[in-house]
Amino acid sequence: MKERRGFTLIELLVVIAIIAVLIALLLPAVQSAREAARRMQCTNNLKQLALALHNYISATNAAPPGVVNTTTYPGTAPPGSLATWTAWSAQSLLLPYVEQGPLYNAANFKWNCCYTPLTGNNQTNTTVYNTRIASFLCPSDGLAGQQNINSYQGCIGDSTIQYPTGGTTTGIFQVYDPTTVSCQSVTLASLTDGTSNTIAFGEGLVGDYSKNSNYRGNGMSTPSDPSGGIVPTTMPGNNAESNPAAVIQALQGCNAFWQTSATRTCSGYTACCLAGVKQYDGQLWALGERGYTLFNTVVPPNSKQYQWRNCRLSIGGNCPSCAPEGSSFVNAGSFHPGGANFAFADGSVRFIKDSVNMLTYESLGTRGSGEVISSDSY
């Protein structure tokens, strides 16, 4: 009688073990290859934005402003300073230069851009601002598949004031109070630090609407009332690089408040929620506002020490130096390991490590502070 051929149990287990080992060895390599492809796509997206910026400058002789406001509001006008939360973004003006001419033509720039619970009842441009633009999305961000998301933000330098005097920030994109200052923009000639040493756009993580303080794409607003939490007593102003002591003191206050913000319960855009976790950064590419389409170069990308996206400090209370409408740290960040991609004013895209020195990073964001930066410093 012939013996039947087959696998013994031991042989089967050995084969399974070998397959498991191979998978364990190959999976990280596959994941690394996928991330490399996503990072390359992200680099290409930023390259498109940098080229769009140059084409816009060629056509208009100046960079687009970071805030493009109108005082016309269909329906109910936003109350008081909330009118400034309806401004168009620089990205909106760059639409024709990123192959989005039809969308640009569909936008009614005579009306404010967006509807949010803060800004009243404007539905004029709903279709426009809800459109998903693939070149504005980093594929490594898990929220990039949603509509109207924005992963790439314009640089306002190391300015932390909401509306600097005269509307002038230290970066390429200008942020102004439309109730007091006319539209501001800068020319390439004003980039005296050199276009290769000046950041134009950087990556920013998108908030997840979870009020989760453990997610570094979320941020916070601190209350002006000292009883509401630990908040800084000063802010570095329009040039953080010149006041490092104020920067550290303010960042420590933000960190302290971040530890308590998760306990705050609120919903919607209420006063309570504005003094708690902010989870809507990057949610509208059309809105010209810090956190949505603008960032500053104070906290290095993907900081392990300051693990939040945004810290907005309200005026008054124990922060008398905070500017009207607040002052902010708005951090760049990504899901790429080790740092984030940045587009420079010369059209190049470079990867800045999360270990970059804070002063070096601040210098890269400013357009005319006179620093000398070597390429091996970041």
Task: Name the predicted role of every residue range.
Residues 2-38, 42, 48:
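N-terminal single-pass transmembrane signal-anchor helix
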Residues 32-378:
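Internal low-complexity, small-residue/proline-rich segments
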